[in-house]
Amino acid sequence: MARQHKSILFLFINGPHHVYHLVIPALRFAALNNKIETIFISGNPVNTQIINDTKAITGINNFTLVDIPLPLRYRLKNYKNRLYPPVYTRIKKIIKYLENANAIISTSHNFPDYLSRYKIKAPTLFYLYHGTGTREYGFETSLEKFDHILIPGKYHRDRLKESLSLKDDQIEMIGKPKLDYLKIKLSKNKKLFNNENPIFYYNPHWEIELSSYLKWKEIILQFFIKNKNYNLIFSPHPLVGHLSTKRGYEINEKDIAEDNILVDMGSNQCLDGTYTSIADIYIGDISSMVTEWVLQKPRPCIFINAHNVNWKNNENYYMWKFGKVVNELKEFKEAVTESISFNQYNEIQKILKSEFIFTADKSS
């Protein structure tokens, strides 16, 4: 039986780090579409604020915004250090919208499983990459459950076709929509430090087994405390703090008071492109944030091999071709000195940029 009500759903029910990848495609669809109701569903107040801020900038408002209320415990300050509820707790609140949708666009790998749990089978499902990472996670078999996958560029297309059972017409290269967000949102004149010294941006990943955060955070902080001629933005992925209680580690760097060190464990600036646009040298491990860094403009990168990984022929560490990989403090100090002088990886960054990101007049 034909569905009487037609709607297209854009789901913003993951963390805020997903929103910046989806909000511009969602708004552009809403602007072009006048036949089918466009619905944005937000899973927490931070997501809602990002959507509303971007709506105000673009002037696009012909969509319905559904804001799922937070459970009471999440309205309490510092509830288990959690920033927002898990995705699966949001699904039950929006069943009627899911059942009435013709198509759903999600950034969550597990979303088809949630639909199956509630026996919702009809909508056409789109998955949009929330980043440009190269780890196995981005190519797992759960993606085969989507009807269409919206990807950044050639690298992901080729690897998906090699790894999964997908047809050509299921994969669409759209570029990196977050870059479109950065173009309209970023302030070019923002100043974070009261000096003109080089700014390093340390951005460890949230997955502790792979991240440099626990093993290297004190090393990094002490180095910059002793070297006042450098500035440091110390800003891990927000999930580092979000998962700290669950994973049993402490966040003890919040109270550092040094003129040359900015510690940010979870503000919007961690994710909205502020730091990647202002800093001069990137320090990281396995985060795909480095591709955002290179795509804004090629600059030096330092990667910390905190777990002594044999990375050179490992596709999960493909992005380490962007810069210098260090295993110990001595190598780190050398890499810092070298990075101030010039970007010796400039040419390969430009080549890899073309492999990773499909470009057209409008990427999303």
Where in the sequence are the language-model features?
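Active-site and donor-binding regions of nucleotide-sugar-utilizing enzymes
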Residues: 10-32, 39-183
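Conserved catalytic-core segment of nucleotide-activated headgroup transferases in glycan assembly
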Residues: 21-33, 179-252, 324-326, 357-363
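Catalytic binding pocket for nucleotide-activated donors in carbohydrate/polymer assembly enzymes
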Residues: 168, 288-356
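Structural alpha-helical scaffold elements that stabilize or flank donor/cofactor-binding regions
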Residues: 94-97, 118, 142, 193, ...
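Nucleotide-activated donor-dependent transferases that construct or modify glycoconjugates
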Residues: 3-16, 25, 201-202, 307
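A short, gly/pro- and small-residue-rich
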Residues: 116-133, 220-223, 297-309
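Structural motif
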Residues: 7, 102-103, 124, 148, ...
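Donor nucleotide-activated moiety binding/catalytic core segment of transferases
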Residues: 246-291, 296
